């Protein structure tokens, strides 16, 4: 077995100069392929990009300005700009083919952008800086890409050696403890469930103590229990100060984990906190249900504080557009009581992040059909 490990390490060393590239499945960094070149970053004012929280000394952990990638005539993504603060969990959402994974590969120095500029872990994204950037980041791809006949420890040891970090054995032990896999260290990866393999892949991504961690669909194909385990690990990483760039199709996952989210559909459609995006896209509403229809709903709902309008939805349901539900709800309740209405329920309508996502993606589809 030890000879197999040595052979694998030697082969990996010949194939790549960086663990990040080794994880990509490519023989060489794309920065050297097909004549592609990075665009020299241009200086911009701090106000030109959308900022995140937790920035240290005004410098974001990760930023992009007008970043784009084309493959011939096909646009993978275009004109993407954002700033992500240190220790922020940033969700990157979008339909299949929107450019999410290509964005991760670009920011991770695995392929070169064709337009725009970026900084990763505080370093400008240029050909000369690729190696230094990869020392500060890790990428966990959607597919774990483990050596199934090797044990968990042997898999991690291969990559710890590639990082050429001091005390690789200690790093492997620490990574195993971080993902709660110390008791499975000697198990062959081929014997593990998909959820446990994802945890091994996450442990591998932590071997170099990354400042920025890219997680590409980390819970894809996992059952709810395994996905919850990954969520708890992400929460722990957030508390330790790691900046996390998370792509996912699970909108409830993004809503639970992310400080802010961006929705990409080739171009960036929106960016912000989930609550702020809901407020921007949807009016706040109160829904009232009565036992019998109101005889004069217009009089009942007239001139109430923070109530901007109303409509009847069926025989006994009334939907009120409100600017502030905490002010409107008591006023609406008093008005209904004074009118002698038998109220069955009154409550605020809540829109989910999925509602925001579908609204924006449907807008794009309608625009294409015009």
Can you say where each PLM-predicted feature lies in the sequence?
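Conserved ABC transporter NBD signature motif
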Residues: 116-125, 133
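ABC transporter nucleotide-binding domain
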Residues: 231-323
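Conserved ABC ATPase "signature" region
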Residues: 138, 157, 161-184
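Short, charged/small-residue-rich alpha-helical element at the C-terminal edge
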Residues: 11, 283-360, 370
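Catalytic Walker B motif of ABC-type/P-loop ATPase nucleotide-binding domains
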Residues: 213-216
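Conserved catalytic motifs of ABC-family nucleotide-binding domains
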Residues: 209
